[in-house]
């Protein structure tokens, strides 16, 4: 088992990574303060892993909420269902919420934990690549609004993140590929050596070799933990983690949440960001080709949706949370392993990239 600590002073917490961790009772017990837990999961994950979790938590009083699966249910209505279940079962401030599922479950359960009685403890138990390498770490919690993704939320850190890599054995191929977009993102924005390692280990990753998967998840979590420790609430360097997301969120919102998976939209968004950087003379064309090839090797899209035009992109991008003083800020790669924030990209350049 590998361990990483997200260093945030009194709110620091461990990330545990390994095989069979859903059965490690001590990992859960050390993060649960009271006697009651509320497990939040969905109709896909619950039949696979809920019974195992309940067996591990046999010493606690357990309630559960099983939600419908999918990004389209990440909304205020579903959020209210979680709160109603907590209230109707008379949960108090010493209840611990356990998010058992992918990014949607983690985001909603975490936001419920942040809001319920002004904050109760929660544990992230991510079951997808995307949630294991990205969304479960760092304390971002949210629900979507019809006008924008993750517009209603809070920064709220978990007590612990427990990553059982065995959960990936039941993950559909499309979901696995979507998660790999966030993995590739770390290589592009922060760690050239990790990007090269990904290029060299495509087969080992796609065949779920435990050593490769464990290292991959650990390295992603190390990078995110380091960045979050420096900038918890995205006032500076943490914004770099949004590489590809300004374009990607526009794709998700315009296409309808769930029609393009988040990782698919981010993959396309990273290519658009890289092409924008190329247009501005910030990055070499050979490195763009490397980025596109690696994204393709994990069966991810490298083009924007054919039915999306510049005006549709721009309307959604204006709602991006990184907009400051009316200026759109873009995260652009200047080389593989390094990104910077730019707030002076002209509409002419953006139009050229999107319509090319």
Swiss-Prot record:
Amino-acid positions noted as binding Zn(2+) in the UniProt annotation, renumbered to this chain: 182, 245, 262
Q: Which pairs are disulfide-linked?
A: none
Q: Name one GO molecular function term.
A: 3-dehydroquinate synthase activity
Q: Which residues form the signal peptide?
A: none
Write out the entry's keywords from A to Z.
Amino-acid biosynthesis, Aromatic amino acid biosynthesis, Cobalt, Cytoplasm, Lyase, Metal-binding, NAD, Nucleotide-binding, Zinc
Q: Give binding positions for NAD(+).
A: 69-74, 103-107, 127-128, 140, 149, 167-170
**Can you state which reaction this protein catalyses?**
7-phospho-2-dehydro-3-deoxy-D-arabino-heptonate = 3-dehydroquinate + phosphate
Q: What is its main location?
A: cytoplasm
GO CC, one annotated term: cytoplasm
Cofactor: binding details: Binds 1 divalent metal cation per subunit. Can use either Co(2+) or Zn(2+).
Q: Which cofactor does it need?
A: Co(2+); Zn(2+); NAD(+)
Q: What is its EC number?
A: 4.2.3.4
Q: What class of enzyme is it?
A: lyase
- Gene Ontology BP, a term: aromatic amino acid family biosynthetic process
Lineage, top-rank taxon, reads Bacteria
Concerning InterPro entries, the annotation shows: Dehydroquinate_synthase (IPR050071), DHQ_synth_AroB (IPR016037), DHQ_synth_fam (IPR030963), DHQS/DOIS_N (IPR030960), DHQS_C (IPR056179)
Task: Give the family this protein belongs to, as stated in its UniProt record.
Answer: Belongs to the sugar phosphate cyclases superfamily. Dehydroquinate synthase family.
Query: What job does the chain carry out?
Result: Catalyzes the conversion of 3-deoxy-D-arabino-heptulosonate 7-phosphate (DAHP) to dehydroquinate (DHQ).
Q: What is this protein called?
A: 3-dehydroquinate synthase
What is the originating organism of this protein? Answer: Psychromonas ingrahamii (strain DSM 17664 / CCUG 51855 / 37)
UniProt gene name: aroB
